[in-house]
């Protein structure tokens, strides 16, 4: 067993994780929690995140606002730019009964202030058309009558909304553990652990990869919604340097330490067999 110790409100708290050589899912060992990007590392980090109050999901107060946030923050839009665009559009949505395509395009065409810079939104015309149609059709969705998967599937029928964006909306609206937001950061983390194969492509098999991710979360006793958000932040901070990391090796087959970046600065901990 591995003994993980952390400080919570100044008090040491601990939990135990399986031995590094044990499998969390077939073919994937837990690894050592103090070595970054192993399954045990993610389990320890998720546990500490929950100690600190968990995650706050949701960017909007209504389904329409959440769709706007996730669509504008989708493919090709850096997170900060997407949020800036959404902030501008949301203000109009809250002050005007109907926001038409022309108004949205005008808002997205104007430079956005991101930090101390002025930047332009890359897909102003395309996204304004998509969002305008989404807002026109979203009133027809009976959100309360749909379970998480059904809501996700319904949202994918809207223009510009694929399974990843739809899953993002559902996760944010419901803190759902039934869907996963499989962007490049989550895919890289899962490939590194061996949960996904090296050629994993959500565009070709979103549901299959999502099933593997959620299966891993359940086997590890983790909330998929929390782990998804945690992986996104961590892998995004690593950036392109992650490409140079080798996938974690299986301690049960090599007899050695898994290949991962060492150090988990938030943890005051020790690992051993007890």
Stretch-by-stretch model annotation:
Residues 1-55, 61, 127-136, 146-152, ...:
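C-terminal accessory module of base-excision DNA glycosylases/AP lyases that mediates lesion recognition
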Residues 48-87:
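DNA-contacting interfaces and partner/effector-binding or oligomerization modules
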Residues 68-71, 113-120, 150-151, 166-172:
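Short, flexible active-site loops
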Residues 75-79, 125, 159, 177, ...:
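Residues at alpha-helix boundaries and short interhelical turns
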Residues 86-159:
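Alpha-helical ds-nucleic-acid-binding substructure associated with the helix-hairpin-helix region
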């Amino acid at each position: 067993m591995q003994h993980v110790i952390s400080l919570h409100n100044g008090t040491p708290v601990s939990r135990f994780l399986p031995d590094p050589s044990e499998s969390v899912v077939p073919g994937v060992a837990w690894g050592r929690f103090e070595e970054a990007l192993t399954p045990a590392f993610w389990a320890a980090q998720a546990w500490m995140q929950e100690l600190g109050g968990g995650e706050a999901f949701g960017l909007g107060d209504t389904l329409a606002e959440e769709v706007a946030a996730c669509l504008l923050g989708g493919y090709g839009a850096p997170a900060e730019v997407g949020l800036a665009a959404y902030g501008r559009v949301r203000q109009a949505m809250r002050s005007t009964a109907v926001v038409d395509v022309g108004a949205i395009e005008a808002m997205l065409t104007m430079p956005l202030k991101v930090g101390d810079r002025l930047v332009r939104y890359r897909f102003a015309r395309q996204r304004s058309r998509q969002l305008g149609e989404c807002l026109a059709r979203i009133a027809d969705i009976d959100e309360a009558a749909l379970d998480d998967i059904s809501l996700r599937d319904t949202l994918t029928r809207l223009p510009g909304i694929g399974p990843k964006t739809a899953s993002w909306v559902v996760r944010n609206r419901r803190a759902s553990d039934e869907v996963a937001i499989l962007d490049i950061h989550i895919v890289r983390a899962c490939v590194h652990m061996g949960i996904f194969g090296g050629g994993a492509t959500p565009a070709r098999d979103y549901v299959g990869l999502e099933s593997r991710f959620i299966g891993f979360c359940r086997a590890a006793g983790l909330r998929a919604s929390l782990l998804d958000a945690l992986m996104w932040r961590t892998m995004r901070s690593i950036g392109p340097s992650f490409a140079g990391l080798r996938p974690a090796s299986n301690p049960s087959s090599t007899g050695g330490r898994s290949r991962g970046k060492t150090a988990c600065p938030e943890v005051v901990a020790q690992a051993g067999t007890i």
